[in-house]
Amino acid sequence: MPRSLKKGPFIDLHLLKKVEKAVESGDKKPIRTWSRRSTIFPTMIGLTIAVHNGRQHVPVFVADEMVGHKLGEFAPTRTYRGHAADKKAKKR
């Protein structure tokens, strides 16, 4: 269910401050964050944000198509290793 338009998009204030500081100084270093719930704003375009996936920080380069999505959508938390192979079919 999407967020109410009356409330507006959500972004953690500490992340917003880091983004504004990076844009102001022109710094291209990745911004580390644990805030997967924050919405991507247009001011973040062109920055690399390292989003925590529970184990490590995954670098995400923000493109203009990502605006409006959440940061957590681009840092998968689970690895899919495939279904278990059928041992009977393997012997044939």
UniProtKB/Swiss-Prot annotation:
A Pfam short name: Ribosomal_S19
Keyword RNA-binding set for record: yes
Matching Gene3D superfamilies: 30s Ribosomal Protein S19, Chain A
Keywords of this entry: Ribonucleoprotein, Ribosomal protein, RNA-binding, rRNA-binding
GO CC list: cytoplasm; small ribosomal subunit
GO biological process, one term: ribosomal small subunit assembly
One of the record's GO molecular function terms: rRNA binding
Keyword ATP-binding: no
Source organism superkingdom: Bacteria
Entries under PROSITE patterns matching the protein: RIBOSOMAL_S19
General function of this protein: Protein S19 forms a complex with S13 that binds strongly to the 16S ribosomal RNA.
Family listed: Belongs to the universal ribosomal protein uS19 family.
Protein name per its UniProtKB record: Small ribosomal subunit protein uS19
Organism: Sodalis glossinidius (strain morsitans)
Gene: rpsS
